[in-house]
Amino acid sequence: MTSQESIGIKFLFGGLSCMGAAVVSNPVDVLKTRFQIHGEGIDSKSLGLVNGTIKIIKNEGISAMYKGLTPSLLREATYSTLRMGGYDVIKNYFIDSNGKTNLLSKVTSGALSGALGACITSPTDLIKVRMQASSKGVKYDSISSAFKEIIAKEGIKGLWKGVGPTTQRAALLTASQIPSYDHIKHMILDHGIIQVDGLQVHIVSSIFAGLIASITTSPVDLVKTRIMNQPFDSNGVGLIYKSSYDCFKKTFQSEGISGLYKGFLPNWFRIGPHTIVTFILYEYLRKVSGIKPI
């Protein structure tokens, strides 16, 4: 396999791994989205993980837990293909004479690949969020109708509403998730805590990576969700928030610091399993294809 083929395969495997993880984590992603928009501008009690799930299933049916799955898969096929594959490509530029890459270089590689992927594919995330946020039926009949309706009502630029916080979140997520997995895994192996680069070390490393990513991204993820889901006037201007900073400030003022972490548990419960499944699949696909592990 040539180096060019190897790079292409890494991009492909990155997207496929994240698509598999999206199927597993979509129900929690729906719950997380509902948590984040719950109580905007009003005083409200927390839905609660169990109560929230029961309420959604009771009112909308169990299929509601898979709202937004199609755009989610499309997003993973585009965004995650770019961020997962791009991480290795960018990281290679930072390899030292000993064949090693330091943590800062890994974080930089993650931030750049995540930001690039999110900026290009932001429309798919916008559609996913709006579908998952709707409790009165899906806002759009299909992905194609969603694209057409958004363009008709909000213009082409409407597809990139929330691109700022989306890109910020993606940069933070990829900068914390992939590098932490990469670094923790090699620390465990180098110190002999686990001696074989196999399933056990992949699970342990991805659990820590998922927790770190959840803590890092929860506030900006909430801001992204609220901006994307808010109503807009005829000129495409948000009726609740003017910018990411405005959303951050209003949320903090009305709901406190805990408001910025609204939906943290479902976010963690989503990112955790998503991260575990992603890296198990990604490492397995690389192994059977003869590509060096992360």
Swiss-Prot record:
TM helices/strands, residue ranges: 11-31, 68-88, 107-127, 162-182, 193-213, 268-285
Mitochondrial matrix-side positions: 32-67, 128-161, 214-267
Keywords: Membrane, Mitochondrion, Mitochondrion inner membrane, Repeat, Transmembrane, Transmembrane helix, Transport
Pfam families: Mito_carr
Residues making up the signal peptide according to the UniProt record: none
Protein origin, superkingdom: Eukaryota
Ranges occupied by Solcar repeats: 9-93, 101-187, 197-288
GO molecular function: transmembrane transporter activity
Location of this chain's protein in the cell: Mitochondrion inner membrane
Membrane topology recorded in Swiss-Prot or TrEMBL: Multi-pass membrane protein
Gene Ontology annotations for the cellular component aspect, listed alphabetically: mitochondrial inner membrane
A Gene Ontology BP annotation from the UniProt entry: response to cadmium ion
Cited PANTHER family: MITOCHONDRIAL DICARBOXYLATE CARRIER-RELATED (PTHR45618)
Family listed: Belongs to the mitochondrial carrier (TC 2.A.29) family.
Protein's name according to its UniProt entry: Mitochondrial substrate carrier family protein ucpB
